[in-house]
Amino acid sequence: MKIHKCAFCGADILPGYGIMYVKSDGTVLRFCSRKCFVSAVKYGRNPRKLAWVRKRQK
């Protein structure tokens, strides 16, 4: 089984979990939670500027 990384926060996503979003150009984005999905797709937020994101650069 393959473990994927969240496209927004970088967390590990186990098989059977998370949200898979396919853009109109065919790009596949995988998210660990609805919070990450909405932040990235709906609001277009930058993960580096949010305190709760794990892959935030300090």
UniProtKB/Swiss-Prot annotation:
BP-aspect Gene Ontology terms: translation
Highest taxon, organism lineage: Archaea
InterPro entries, alphabetized: L24e/L24_sf, Ribosomal_eL24, Ribosomal_eL24-rel_arc, Ribosomal_eL24-rel_N, Ribosomal_eL24_CS, TRASH_dom
Start-end of C4-type zinc fingers: 6-36
Cofactor info, note text: Binds 1 zinc ion per subunit.
An annotated Gene Ontology molecular function: rRNA binding
CDD domains listed in its UniProt record: Ribosomal_L24e_L24 (cd00472)
Keywords assigned: Metal-binding, Ribonucleoprotein, Ribosomal protein, RNA-binding, rRNA-binding, Zinc, Zinc-finger
Self-association state and partner proteins as the record states: Part of the 50S ribosomal subunit. Forms a cluster with proteins L3 and L14.
Binding site residues for Zn(2+): C6, C9, C32, C36
Family assignment from sequence similarity: Belongs to the eukaryotic ribosomal protein eL24 family.
Organism: Pyrobaculum aerophilum (strain ATCC 51768 / DSM 7523 / JCM 9630 / CIP 104966 / NBRC 100827 / IM2)
UniProt-listed PROSITE patterns: RIBOSOMAL_L24E
PANTHER family noted in UniProt: 60S RIBOSOMAL PROTEIN L24, RIBOSOMAL PROTEIN L24
Record-linked NCBIfam families: PRK14891.1-1
Purpose of the protein: Binds to the 23S rRNA.
Needed cofactors: Zn(2+)
Gene Ontology, cellular component aspect: ribonucleoprotein complex; ribosome
Primary gene name: rpl24e
SMART domains: TRASH (SM00746)
Name assigned to this protein: Large ribosomal subunit protein eL24
